Design a protein with these regions (language model features):
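Conserved serine/cysteine hydrolase catalytic core
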Residues: 205-258, 267
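Conserved HGGG/HGGXW glycine-rich cap/lid loop of the alpha/beta-hydrolase fold
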Residues: 31-75
Length: 292
């Protein structure tokens, strides 16, 4: 059985590299491991690539894994005067691919990252992507933005007046309390929540929470484009879904199954928002078994 390293060990075995995003150079953390078919794993909000720590040992035997931290998250740079956007995060993924020499890859996208993957899919459809996406696995995210149900803390952060004030005073206790309802009842989330907080608060990252939360507005602005990207693509898609998720759970699953009835869909009935943390064995099995 592979041992799962803690956050410091995770960072120690990755690297922080300078990538050009727009007109500026930004430091981005990436972790690569394994050998074989390329698989790019993209994390959610408000966490980091460490979300994949329980899966990586199971996947790396037959896959070359690439796991970046998005700008503003984890061990990546966290500029305080910045307009964060999902489009820029898609640029970041492209830059990570270019640096690693990736020509084709499968994508695994959770939460926040489902929109990044949808944008990359749209770019591929337009002939504007240099990397071939061979398949995408989506996990618990706002694929259909109008069905996304933000948690109270997220809504408060999105408010122009409250958001900066909350970012200025948020602490580990408030943060982990906000995460609590997103885990399944009975799941002991203490360790995972603590690690997510440590990744978030690195370099004072909690202070930009109100800037990162703008992804919700990005989804509203780009929703038509991103929905078309998944509903019109020939790229194999599959879904691994925690049905107890209060944010994007059973209600989102219903729409996905209605609009994409032929896509493989694994419903995890006892899992909430964090399939990779709550049910890593089942998620790994699905990723290794499905065609996407």
């Amino acid at each position: 059985m592979h041992l799962v390293g803690n956050l410091e060990q995770w960072w120690e075995h990755g690297e922080r590299v300078a990538l050009r995003l727009g007109d500026t150079d930004n430091i981005v953390f990436t972790r690569a491991e394994g050998a074989g078919q390329s698989m790019t794993l993209l994390h959610g909000f408000p966490s980091s690539s460490h979300d994949w720590a329980k899966l990586a040992p199971r996947l790396s035997a037959g896959h070359s894994l690439l796991m970046p931290d998005f700008l503003g998250f984890g061990a990546s740079e966290k500029p305080t005067e910045h307009r964060y956007s999902l489009l820029e995060q898609a640029d970041l993924v492209e830059a990570v691919w270019a640096r690693a020499g990736v020509g084709s890859t499968r994508i695994v996208a959770h939460d926040y990252a489902v929109s990044v993957a949808q944008e990359l899919l749209a770019r591929q459809a337009e002939g504007a992507l240099s990397v071939a996406i061979e398949g995408i696995h989506f996990m618990n995210g706002g694929i259909y933005p109008e069905l996304h149900r933000p948690q109270p803390l997220q809504l408060a952060l999105l408010d122009p007046q409250q958001g900066p004030q909350i970012s200025a005073v948020i602490n580990g206790e408030l943060f982990t309390a906000g995460l609590g309802p997103t885990f399944a009842p009975g799941f002991d989330a203490r360790s995972d929540s603590a690690e997510i907080w440590r990744a978030t608060s690195r370099d004072g990252g909690e202070g930009i929470s109100h800037l990162l939360i703008r992804y919700i507005s990005d989804r509203e602005e780009n929703g038509d484009r991103w929905i078309a990207a998944i509903e019109q693509t020939d790229v194999p898609l599959a879904f691994i879904w925690g049905m107890l998720d209060p944010v994007s759970g059973a209600h989102m699953a219903e729409r996905i199954r209605e609009r994409l009835p032929d896509a493989p869909f694994l419903a995890l009935e006892d899992v909430a928002h964090w399939p990779a943390l709550e049910a890593p064995e089942r998620v790994a099995h699905a990723l290794l078994s499905d065609s996407a």
